[in-house]
């Protein structure tokens, strides 16, 4: 039962004249009312867009799409609404569900969140398998169970790093009929092992979710589009010749009128193709529903635990660089320090994930020598449903990070 004023969301209707005359038209494809009741207008539009793309109804070669809405516009809910619809409806005469198996690939820190969102919106009606244990044996067992012919599990939720380990299990059409990649800007480099592993999937229905605006790097744009709809922009060389070089030439300060005209022409040609399967909305569409945004910057002191780990990271990297003579991976160090400044558990999770994936870093990433700092703090779980790769937060863990401590005090006042 829908609230007053909310209409059903119909994604497809049978327009076959012969079946209509024979009064044997196929049932319309509708989004379940338990989800429709919560969808805002822009989300209804988004679900329709996703459905038309993966079902080949938008007039382009492929079955993938990119939903690039700003953060806060409900990309997760839109994806779940589509997923549930495909698991339960069909446009074929046999009326067998369009998809039987779904794989959701996301950063490690979002595995538990995706599982919780599926449970929240679908009220436990879908059987999910979140891979968030801290041992390879657990992951091996979960993947095997998900792929078993008699398995009741419909949705596998897995981190990018873990999927890369088991990607060869998903090269058949029966293993997965829909893949959803969250934080999909991670696939902007087509040369990475993660991108290559995902590209080997037999599944052609590929949804990419990213709240990060696409930059002006055409090679990165090409990589994302090519994963989404392989071959739609040609080979790398063909894309460079037809689009990249002319467009970049037109951006040069001293570009001629002819180069500018050609750049605009190729830009328009490219837009005509990609706008069929890329949808981006900004959060300005919510402005009429929300009060004006007020931003206040609060400076938070680090905790003793954060300071100790911070000093360790700096001294350890300097020591390794001096000992080996190798240049430090500055970006990796900065990333680790940024994580630490948010909360020490992010460092703990990174150590666990690296160990679990069997990585060795050569001193350029977060090292195992940090483990003693976390003794007894976050290892209370992590293998259960809804846990995370690095264990669960201990009681009082919010006081281990300066930002979290300030947030905890604010919430207490509220």
Model-flagged regions — what are they?
Residues 1-2, 34:
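Charged, low-complexity alpha-helical linker segments
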Residues 12-251, 271-296, 301-308, 312-414:
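ASCE P-loop NTPase motor core, strongest for the SF2 helicase catalytic module
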Residues 4, 250-257:
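Intrinsically disordered, low-complexity proline-rich segments enriched in Ser/Thr
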Residues 2-8:
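Structured recognition/catalytic domains enriched at protein termini
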Residues 256-265, 295-301:
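A short helix-loop-helix "switch/interaction" segment in the helical subdomain of ASCE P-loop NTPases
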């Amino acid at each position: 039962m829908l609230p007053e004023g909310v209409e059903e969301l119909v994604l497809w209707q049978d327009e076959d004249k012969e079946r209509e005359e024979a009064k044997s038209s196929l049932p319309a494809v509708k989004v379940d009312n338990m989800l429709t009741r919560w969808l805002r207008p822009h989300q209804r539009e988004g679900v329709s867009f996703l459905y038309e793309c993966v079902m080949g109804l938008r007039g382009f070669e492929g079955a993938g799409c990119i939903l690039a809405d700003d953060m806060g516009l409900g990309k997760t809910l839109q994806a779940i609404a589509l997923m549930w619809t495909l698991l339960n409806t069909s446009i074929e005469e046999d009326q067998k569900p369009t998809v039987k198996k779904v794989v959701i690939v996301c950063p490690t820190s979002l595995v538990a969140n995706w599982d919780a969102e599926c449970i929240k919106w679908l009220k436990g009606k879908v059987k999910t398998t979140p891979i968030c244990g801290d041992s390879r044996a657990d992951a091996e067992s979960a993947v095997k169970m998900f792929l078993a012919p008699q398995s009741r599990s419909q949705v596998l939720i897995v981190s990018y790093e873990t999927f890369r380990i088991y990607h060869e299990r998903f090269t058949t059409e029966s293993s997965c009929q829909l893949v959803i990649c969250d934080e999909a800007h991670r696939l902007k480099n087509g040369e990475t092992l993660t991108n290559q592993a995902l590209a080997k999937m037999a599944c052609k229905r590929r949804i990419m979710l990213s709240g990060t605006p696409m930059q002006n790097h055409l090679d990165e744009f090409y990589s994302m589009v090519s994963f989404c709809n392989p071959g739609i922009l040609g080979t790398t060389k063909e894309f460079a010749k037809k689009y990249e070089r002319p467009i970049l030439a037109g951006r040069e300060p001293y570009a001629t009128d002819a180069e500018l005209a050609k750049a605009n022409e190729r830009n328009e040609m490219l837009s005509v193709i990609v706008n069929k399967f890329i949808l981006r909305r900004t959060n300005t569409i919510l402005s009429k529903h929300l009060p004006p945004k007020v931003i206040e910057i609060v400076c938070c002191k680090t905790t003793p635990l954060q300071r100790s780990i911070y000093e360790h990271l700096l001294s350890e990297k300097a020591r390794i660089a001096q000992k080996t003579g190798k240049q430090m991976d500055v970006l990796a160090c900065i990333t680790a320090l940024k994580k630490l400044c948010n909360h020490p558990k992010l460092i703990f999770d990174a150590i666990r994930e690296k160990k679990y994936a069997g990585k060795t870093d050569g001193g350029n990433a977060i090292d195992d020598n940090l483990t003693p700092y976390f003794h007894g703090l976050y290892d209370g779980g992590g293998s259960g449903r809804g846990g995370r790769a690095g264990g669960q937060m201990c009681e009082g863990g919010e006081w281990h990070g300066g930002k979290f401590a300030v947030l905890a005090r604010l919430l207490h006042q509220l």
